[in-house]
């Protein structure tokens, strides 16, 4: 449930708390703008990735499928500052060879990115949604991102990137599958 009025009131209160006049010309519409922005940034809250993965095709394909460099942005739940980067996903279809359209994997990323988030959990959620939705033999997810909470505040280290992974099934059990995936996502175009 998205409460636009509560967000507008909270933004107005925050502006007052930092000593600003929320009625001055440049800030009059800020509470409304922020509420609209949050509606977009957190639109994944009420979406179910299982719905996205429901439609698939049993093609008999049993080899690794990879989509890499899926761009995303999300909001860190600790400071409500953005983090952004790319997600790499690989999966190995099950015995039926069930695959999904590649845009479906990007949509799963979007659903989880558009929530208050931490990168580690996002990798886990994406991997779990894909292995549960596709019933595939294995899933690998790698996320590389730059966090504004490390750039704008605190330690102030621009350019540093956080890399997280989540491995399920055959990618967790098989060093060869894991190595092939990691090798393929590192290849340049």
Swiss-Prot record:
Cellular component GO terms, alphabetical: cytoplasm
Residues the record lists as binding Zn(2+): 76, 79, 149
Pfam families registered for this protein in UniProt: GTP_cyclohydroI (PF01227)
EC number: 3.5.4.16
One of the protein's GO biological processes: one-carbon metabolic process
Uppermost EC category: hydrolase
Catalysed reactions listed for this entry: GTP + H2O = 7,8-dihydroneopterin 3'-triphosphate + formate + H(+)
Family annotation (InterPro entries): GTP-CH-I_C/QueF (IPR043133), GTP-CH-I_N (IPR043134), GTP_CycHdrlase_I (IPR001474), GTP_CycHdrlase_I_CS (IPR018234), GTP_CycHdrlase_I_dom (IPR020602)
Record-stated family: Belongs to the GTP cyclohydrolase I family.
HAMAP family: FolE
The protein's name in its UniProt record: GTP cyclohydrolase 1
Gene: folE
């Amino acid at each position: 449930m998205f409460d636009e009025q509560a967000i507008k009131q909270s933004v107005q209160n925050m502006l007052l708390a930092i000593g600003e006049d929320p009625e001055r010309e440049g800030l009059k519409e800020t509470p409304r703008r922020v509420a609209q922005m949050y509606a977009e940034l957190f639109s994944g809250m009420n979406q179910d990735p299982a719905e996205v993965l429901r439609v698939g095709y049993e093609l008999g394909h049993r080899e690794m499928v990879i989509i890499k460099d899926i761009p995303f942005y999300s909001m860190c739940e600790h400071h409500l500052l953005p983090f952004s980067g790319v997600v790499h996903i690989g999966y190995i279809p099950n015995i039926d060879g069930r695959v999904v359209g590649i845009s479906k994997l990007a949509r799963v990323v979007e659903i989880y990115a558009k929530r208050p988030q931490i990168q580690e959990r996002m990798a886990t959620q994406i991997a779990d949604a894909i292995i549960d939705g596709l019933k595939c033999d294995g899933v690998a997810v790698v996320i590389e991102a730059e966090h504004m909470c490390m750039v704008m505040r605190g330690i102030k280290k621009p350019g540093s990137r956080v890399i997280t992974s989540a491995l399920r099934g055959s990618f967790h059990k098989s060093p060869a599958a894991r190595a092939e995936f990691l090798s393929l996502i590192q290849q340049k175009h």
